[in-house]
């Protein structure tokens, strides 16, 4: 039960009405006025009862608030700080432990790695144990290993870091080797992958046949017999001619390459770039080295129009003719050349026909020519 301090404050007595005047002095009220007075009385009574109820509610509310004031007046920030600090304390410990574990793991990892590296370089695993070769066809594997200068038993990684140097040693010693790639094979061994140039032709010399590589280089080694399927190059005495020829030859279609049996260097007095290309079908092509790849592309069309084997002249234009015509032209050219070369010089003092090359000394053949001329 809540204690009410002053009942008079809550339940106020209604003020006394002013003394009524005597009935004689007051006029008689009409029915309407009587009803109005009764209505006003009811309104006043209702207002008084309503005010008393509101005052009681306000008093009860104030008493409840007075009991709650000790708790409400406590500093809110202090309570919140105590709660937050208590909640954060376990998290702070966990974070510190995680950092310590991470640092410890990092230190142990670095230390363990350093120990393993030191043990590796001390062990035989850090030394080259074996070298193998693959892809070689023309050069023996042992010769490649020896010329590479790789040393088994020496440091593996030191030699691997200088692998370009060892590859260059191989290519320098063996021109046929196009590329030598040194790579790791297993834990402590090397593998040398070899790529060789193709032998595309043979250079004919007095001592035999020298292989000609696709890059135009001629190997020093010789073979007594010509390899089948490879064209033979003849009369190429100058070293620069074969690389120039190979630059054009490599551009030819494979069908044309397979149809070539021999290429001879045949310069004329006016053209030092001429070659004769002998085909397997019996034809002979006269063409410039610089025009070989361009004009030989039309050879198949020209050969189909020829009735029998002959000559395809591609020096200036492109035309063909049989071998008989060449023999006739060659005979006339030879007779003209011999007449010019055998032209006689007459010595007026001696009265004898002499050859300028013999310094005025007549020969039996010259005497016969002089007599015939007379």
Swiss-Prot record:
It is a single-pass type II membrane protein. Residues 126-197 form the POTRA domain. The gene is divIB. Residues 56-75, 356-374 have a biased composition (Polar residues). The lineage of its organism: Bacteria, Bacillati, Bacillota, Bacilli, Lactobacillales. PROSITE patterns: POTRA. Residues 1-90, 325-374 are annotated as: Disordered. Pfam families: FtsQ_DivIB_C, POTRA_1. This is Cell division protein DivIB. The keyword Cell wall biogenesis/degradation does not apply.
């Amino acid at each position: 039960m809540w204690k009410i301090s002053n009942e008079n404050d809550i339940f106020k007595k209604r003020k006394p009405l002013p003394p009524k005047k005597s009935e004689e002095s007051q006029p008689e009220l009409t029915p309407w006025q009587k009803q109005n007075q009764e209505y006003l009385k009811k309104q006043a009574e209702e207002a008084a009862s309503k005010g008393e109820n509101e005052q009681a509610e306000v008093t009860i509310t104030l008493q409840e608030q007075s009991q709650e004031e000790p708790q409400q007046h406590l500093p809110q920030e202090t309570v919140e700080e105590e709660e937050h600090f208590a909640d954060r304390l376990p998290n702070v410990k966990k974070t510190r432990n995680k950092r310590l574990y991470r640092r410890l793991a990092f230190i142990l990892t670095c230390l363990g790695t350093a120990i393993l590296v030191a043990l590796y370089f001390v062990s035989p695993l850090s030394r080259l144990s074996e070298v193998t070769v693959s892809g070689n066809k023309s050069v023996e594997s042992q010769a490649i290993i020896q010329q590479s200068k790789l040393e088994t038993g020496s440091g593996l990684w030191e030699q691997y870091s200088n692998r370009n140097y060892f590859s260059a040693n191989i290519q320098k010693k063996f021109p046929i080797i196009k590329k030598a790639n040194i790579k790791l094979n297993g834990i402590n061994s090397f593998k040398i992958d070899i790529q060789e140039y193709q032998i595309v032709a043979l250079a004919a010399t007095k001592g035999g046949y020298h292989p000609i590589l696709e890059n135009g280089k001629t190997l020093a080694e010789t073979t007594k017999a010509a390899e089948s399927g490879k064209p033979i190059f003849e009369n190429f005495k100058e070293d620069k001619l074969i690389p120039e020829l190979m630059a054009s030859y490599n551009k030819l279609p494979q069908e044309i390459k397979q149809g070539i049996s021999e290429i001879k260097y045949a310069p004329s007095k006016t053209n030092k770039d001429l070659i004769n290309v002998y085909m397997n079908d019996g034809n002979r092509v006269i063409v410039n080295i610089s025009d070989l790849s361009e004009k030989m592309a039309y050879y198949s069309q020209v050969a189909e129009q020829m009735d029998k084997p002959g000559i395809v002249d591609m020096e200036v234009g492109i035309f063909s003719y049989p071998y008989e015509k060449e023999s006739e032209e060659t005979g006339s050219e030879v007779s003209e050349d011999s007449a010019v070369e055998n032209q006689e010089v007459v010595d007026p003092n001696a009265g004898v026909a002499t050859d300028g090359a013999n310094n005025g000394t007549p020969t039996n053949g010259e005497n016969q020519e002089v007599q015939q001329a007379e």
